[in-house]
Amino acid sequence: MVIKPVVGSGSSGVQMCRTVDEVAEHTRHLLGGGHMWQARPRILVEEFAQGQYLTADMMGGCLVGIGTGHFGPPPHFVYREYSYPALLSNDESARIADVSLSCLRALGLGWGPANIEFRWTKRGPVVIEVNPRLAGTPDPELIQLAYGVDLVDEHIKLVIGEECDLRARHSRTASARFLAPDRDGMLEVIEGASRAAAIPGVAEVKMYVHPHTPIVRKGDYRDLIGHVIAASPSRDQTAALLQQAVDLVNWTITPFGPKGG
């Protein structure tokens, strides 16, 4: 099962638990002062839905796009890659759209942006979360690259009473790969980011940290140190561009010395 805070974002405090002992341990961590709460401490206990992760981006009750994502190793849920559009059949896309609209109607969320997370299981699409807001970075950037729709601009239009235009201007594949360190320590050097950014088809290479930053992994989005975004007319080409760029970005982390040493 999955234990997570009722209120939060970015996978903070979210953990898969396979045994009763793991459930008890993570619950004690969340409620015993180990988690920074944004609201009154309450936890959710959910069945883990096994299957492809999907996200539906909505605006004013209209489906703009469906993306897919991959995570790092359990028990945490740290994003490693995001892509638009998800590789789905027409029937599968229609089911995601239908369930998304049903969620919005049930919750009274007909206006403005919404981001709905799914797992496609053996039972079909299972709703994980319904978020009444735009998805965080880099989803809006990927949607703009994939479909030519700027969700931030279209949201502003809704706010000021103008009509938004959600029609796709083009059809491309856009993907983001997140850069995650494999150890704790002092980040000494980052190399190759400018060379990666110069590759045609690479839209962005962004580092979240600078050299001489201590790295202490927490099992959530704060573990990530950067991302690379690429887009092209085909899925295979985008994947190749992304890998080429990621291979150029290198960093060095020196493990922390013994405490008190």
What is each PLM-predicted segment?
Residues 10-11, 39, 50-52, 62-63, ...:
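A generic structural signal for well-ordered coil/turn residues at beta-strand boundaries
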Residues 30-35, 39-42, 47-86, 94-127, ...:
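Phosphate-binding core of ATP-grasp and ATP-grasp-like enzymes
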Residues 15, 47, 144, 225-232:
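Short, well-ordered beta-strand elements within core beta-sheets of diverse protein domains
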Residues 143-153:
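Gly/Ser/Thr-rich active-site loops/lids in small-molecule metabolic enzymes
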Residues 156-261:
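Peripheral (often C-terminal) accessory segments that flank ATP-dependent C-N-forming ligase machineries
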